[in-house]
Amino acid sequence: MRIAIVNDTAMAVEALKRVLLTVPGHEISWIARDGTEAVARCARDTPDLILMDLFMPVMDGVEATRQIMKQSPCAIIIVTASVSKNAGKVFEAMGYGARDAVNVPILGTQESSDSAQLLLTKIATIAKLIGKSSPTSTPKPQTAKLTSFSTHSTLLPPLVAIGSSTGGPKALAAILSRLPANFGAAIAIVQHVDMQFSAGLVDWLNQQTALTVQLATVGDRFEKGIVLVAGTNDHLSLHSDLTLHYTKEPIDYPYRPSVDVFFKSLAQYWNAKGTAVLLTGMGQDGAQGLSLLRSRGWHTIAQDEKSSVVYGMPKAAVQLNAAVEILPPEAIATSLIQQIMFRKSGVPKSDTRK
């Protein structure tokens, strides 16, 4: 795997080089000292992956990520001194397309050893997603056996389920910021993000919306006006008693938490129609689940190509004819409001594409 390093600190660059070269098959394609240099180098020689610092002279990592994903896109991991202390910047970079984030593994401490192992794990996951890992079969989430549940659908709150990955935080903020405080539906979000950042994502989203955003915990139920966000590296899933749980299965599935696992659990146990949205992201996670939900009568939406940072997941959904509508985030918010209003009034909405 060809990996570039963008960092202005010599010690950090050396630490990253040592960590990367412990894995056969990894090579350093180039090193840049600031964002401007990285944008130029990437345009000439696009690597498989960039390890991007946040704070550098001339151009910082957020702006460099934005320009690279627009001009010569590739996978990007933010590697900086303290991810937790810079959560806002991290999610801003993720909104522009950064795939993940980890503390820089400065040599000599147990914490750095843990960071090094975490970095290699994240790189291995990205390698699977972009087809740069050793050939192995990628397991698919099991298809849910569809059964009906006895709870009458009129007792259940309107539900909006959203799946997102690369570029997701920005798209989520664009949608949630446009929903009113009295939005009459429950919302559940599965964003591909490491559990160490999930609390930070919730805090950041709470600053973007009038709704209440919180981590989904075991035993939670959907509630109007509450936005629940998957909060662990395990897969969020709805159980037959309509409470939320986490499951490790499928263990080797590269997307964690998985949108497909969540969507398929909704198709199995949620005995009411809802609205499901699949946003920007690498790979195909969520496409099968969205298709299944559409077949169960849900209103389904995929983000359009123009507004997607990575047109992978929504593209796969469109190819499966899983999306009733194909829209940018701002229009998705409008559609969600219309869906809730139509359901309250009992007026059906036509099945149209845009």
UniProtKB/Swiss-Prot annotation:
Which SMART domains would you find in this protein's record?
REC
Record's protein name = Protein-glutamate methylesterase/protein-glutamine glutaminase
- List its EC numbers: 3.1.1.61, 3.5.1.44
Where does it live in the cell?
A: Cytoplasm
Membrane-spanning segments: none
Q: Which family does it belong to?
A: Belongs to the CheB family.
Q: What is known of its domains?
A: Contains a C-terminal catalytic domain, and an N-terminal region which modulates catalytic activity.
A single GO CC term for this protein reads: cytoplasm
What sequence ranges are listed for the domain Response regulatory?
2-119
GO biological process terms, semicolon-separated: chemotaxis
Give a short account of its post-translational modification: Phosphorylated by CheA. Phosphorylation of the N-terminal regulatory domain activates the methylesterase activity.
Q: Name one GO molecular function term.
A: phosphorelay response regulator activity
Ordered alphabetically, the record's keywords are: Chemotaxis, Cytoplasm, Hydrolase, Phosphoprotein
User: What CDD domains does this protein map onto?
Assistant: CheB_Rec (cd16432), REC_CheB-like (cd17541)
